[in-house]
Amino acid sequence: MADDSGHGQLWAGITALYAEPGVAQACLAAQDEAGADVLLLLAAALQARCGISIAGAGPALVAAGEPWRSEVVRPLRGLRRRWRGLDGVEALREHLKVLELEAERVQLERLAPLLAGPSAEATSALLRANLSAVEPSLSLQRLDGLATALERGWRAAPGG
């Protein structure tokens, strides 16, 4: 992905948002508890920050991303997690982390055409609607906690 492309800007926004305090923890809790796709959660949040509703595209985004996620991203993540704390594999585990992130970049590039949507005002309600569109199984409590962390993060992240 070229850095000057819309995909590159979206990826940069995702990594910046993920680095904000509380965002990673909220996303990983949703991933561990509900099987949420962190990449989709972050992309949905960034689109909401730009005032773009993806509510109508939620099922298509999930369906389009699932084959790559299940065949590439999840196996890399699973192996990396299983190797946590094992002696002598730290460097190899870091390589897996790099591959996992690159696989998520490729997933984002594949999903980018589906992330376009009608413009609206960037509001908390739009953020929650976008998150619900890509992860409808999240409990209301998990959705609220995630939305709060993401909204706090998007205000602090560059471009917020």
What are these regions (language model features)?
Residues 10-32:
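Short amphipathic alpha-helical segments and their helix-coil junctions
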Residues 27-28, 44, 77-81, 112-116:
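Amphipathic alpha-helical segments within well-ordered protein domains
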Residues 25-63:
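N-terminal interaction modules that seed assembly of large macromolecular complexes
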Residues 49-111:
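Structured binding/interaction patches within domain cores
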Residues 83-153, 157-160:
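A charged, amphipathic interaction segment
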Residues 5, 21, 36-40, 71-75:
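Short acidic alpha-helix initiation/capping motifs at coil-to-helix transition points
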Residues 1-16, 146-159:
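Charged, compositionally biased N-terminal leader segments and the immediate start
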